[in-house]
Amino acid sequence: CVGCAFSALDNKDIQAAYNYIQDLGGKEQATIIGWGTKENLPQATLINSLLVRALDYNDIYWEQDPSHPSDIIPAVLSTGEFMKKDGKEVLVGIIIAYELEMRLCLAAFPGVREIGWHHATLTQLVSPVVAGRMLGLNEEEIVAAIGINGSSHFTLGGVVAGHLTNMKNAADPFAVEAGVQAALLSSKGYTGPVEVFEGKEGLFEVMDKVKWDRDILTKGLGDSFLINQCGYKAFPTEALTHQPITAALEV
């Protein structure tokens, strides 16, 4: 994760994003990897997640849906730094991020990617939980944060279809940033729909072209951890290119 971030510091898209964040300014709350400067929590989360994702080299989990769970780690790092959490708490936050993201990748048949949605649609439901926990939110506040983010950040699959732009590697980081924003809003008393999954016009009802196995989301939670099943890339390229690259190298 951190290695991917440092390796991406000279990317043009990263430079553009960093300049954008510098122009915005704000309170110095969390550190930007590589630069060492500090920005407010959402902005630091965004640029750090962009750094992790920029080279397309970070980890991958692909079952019914694909995902890059390490995109969410910057939400843990920024809020953890701000709240002065110790290493144990940061590790717990990372494990929670992986567990929830990967369970969502298992729960839809077919995956949401198969019906035209990007996996950031799943990340938007995970990032507020992780950020909320690190910020010390109670259960009611975390539910509100999920509702805030989960009702407002569905992402079209078009970001990875056809001619690719910088949004290919930015869609998930934006969902991570938004999760931190949602948690911060909730901490101030802001509310969101509490049944964003199962309620009227919620996730399960609106995405009715897939069948959701709700038990996958909670069954055996805490007994074992999916983070151990996440994969790593051999090349800094899109996952589906790895087979032809390997074949070419062996010819």
Residue positions per predicted region:
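N-terminal core-entry segment
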Residues: 1-227
